[in-house]
From Swiss-Prot:
It catalyses: IMP + NH4(+) + NADP(+) = GMP + NADPH + 2 H(+). InterPro entries: Aldolase_TIM (IPR013785), GMP_reductase (IPR050139), GMPR (IPR005993), IMP_DH/GMP_Rdtase_CS (IPR015875), IMP_DH_GMPRt (IPR001093). It is an enzyme of class 1 (oxidoreductase). Gene3D superfamilies: Aldolase class I (3.20.20.70). PROSITE patterns: IMP_DH_GMP_RED (PS00487). K(+) binds at residues 181, 183. GO terms for cellular component: cytosol; GMP reductase complex. NADP(+) binds at residues 108-131, 216-239. This is GMP reductase. Homotetramer. GO terms for biological process: purine nucleotide metabolic process. It comes from Vibrio campbellii (strain ATCC BAA-1116). The active site is at residue 186.
């Protein structure tokens, strides 16, 4: 047993230090990034925010809506191959280029991924997603998928430390997904005692990945636009959002009416709700590691994504970053014990 003494930080522990800026307006800030990925050699241009691959977030409808903003969607893995074929026939090229095909690591998952990727050459992203990215099986699976799809962009995770980040990149991942337990409907840290404060995980994994020419996705922990900006400032190349994009008409969640008001069900992908729906219940050897909540129905996602991107643009103006790419270079975090003034409630 050993104890690491260094304090690790989450988004709530810091604020940006403002800096002198020549920018006159948020409209001058360019949030588009141009990436060339390490293994596939693929190029991609867009706003590096990703809707999470959760049942009630990463839907085909969400993908079509967010593509209008240049934003990506990691489509959840529970659509059938036939569903994907129909989607490919109804979506434009920009939408297809901005979706990630999510998969687990079983033999059935591998075959399904091959079937989906064969539908359209416009599918360029594969998201290999398991809860515990420290499994040797994941490394082997990444190698297998890389061999099968040498020209596709592969994301793999989730991990929170630089050593495993490096191992996944060396195995063939272009992007590593970073985050264990920070999500709004995740209870892994409570059920297992395992986790890592998300900002420190992003800083450390970003440093490791960038040293090898890889990239990272900061997955989870964002509750407001300021947190998204902090993730980018800490070195995330992409930021994945679940709860912030849940509850919208495009989210694909179950709508429930109570007392004349509409709510949408939102749950973690290791929750009892998810396992009841997809796995025939919680297996006898495991515990559910997610919550199920009812969110007030929020209407269209377009207003929400504009608000998030507007907040990030505003961050850039405060620190003098004309491009999102410059934000991490312009970032100085100050440690704090307060965030917003809650006299009139939380924003």
């Amino acid at each position: 047993m050993r104890i690491e003494q260094e304090l690790k930080l989450g988004f709530k522990d810091v604020l940006f230090r403002p800096k002198r800026s020549t920018l006159k307006s948020r409209s001058q800030v360019n949030l588009t990034r141009d990436f060339t990925f390490k293994h596939s050699g693929r190029q991609w241009s867009g706003v590096p925010v990703i809707a999470a691959n959760m049942d009630s977030v990463g839907s085909f409808a969400m993908a079509k809506a967010l593509a209008e903003h240049g934003v990506m969607t990691a489509v959840h893995k529970h659509y059938t191959v036939e569903d994907w074929a129909e989607f490919a026939n109804t979506a434009d090229k920009a939408t297809l280029n901005n979706v990630m095909v999510s998969t687990g690591t079983s033999e059935a998952d591998f075959q399904k991924t091959k079937d989906i990727m064969a539908i359209s050459d416009e599918f360029i992203f594969i998201c290999i997603d398991i809860a515990n990215g420290y499994s040797e099986h994941l490394v082997e699976y990444v190698q297998r998928v890389r061999a099968a799809f040498p020209d596709k962009v592969i994301s793999a995770g989730n991990v929170v430390t630089g050593d495993m980040c490096e191992e996944l990149i060396l195995a063939g991942a272009d992007i590593v997904k970073v985050g264990i337990g920070p999500g709004s409907v995740c209870t892994t840290r409570v059920k297992t005692g395992v986790g890592y404060p998300q900002l420190s995980a992003i800083i450390e994994c970003g440093d490791a990945a960038h040293g090898l020419g890889g990239m990272i996705i900061g997955d989870g922990g964002c509750s407001c636009a300021g947190d998204v900006a902090k993730a980018f400032g800490g070195g995330a190349d992409f930021v994945m959002l679940g709860g912030m994009l849940a509850g919208h008409e495009e989210s694909g969640g179950e709508v429930i009416e109570q007392d004349g008001k509409q709510f949408m069900k939102f749950y973690g992908m290791s929750s009892k709700s998810a396992m009841d729906k997809h796995s025939g219940g919680v297996a006898g050897y495991r515990a559910a590691e997610g919550k199920t909540v009812l969110l007030p129905f929020r209407g269209s996602v377009h207003g929400t994504i504009q608000d998030i991107l507007g907040g990030v643009r505003s961050t850039c103006t405060y620190v003098g970053a004309a491009k999102l790419k410059e934000l991490t270079k312009r970032t100085t975090f100050i440690r704090v014990q307060e965030q917003e003034n809650n006299v009139f409630g939380k924003e």
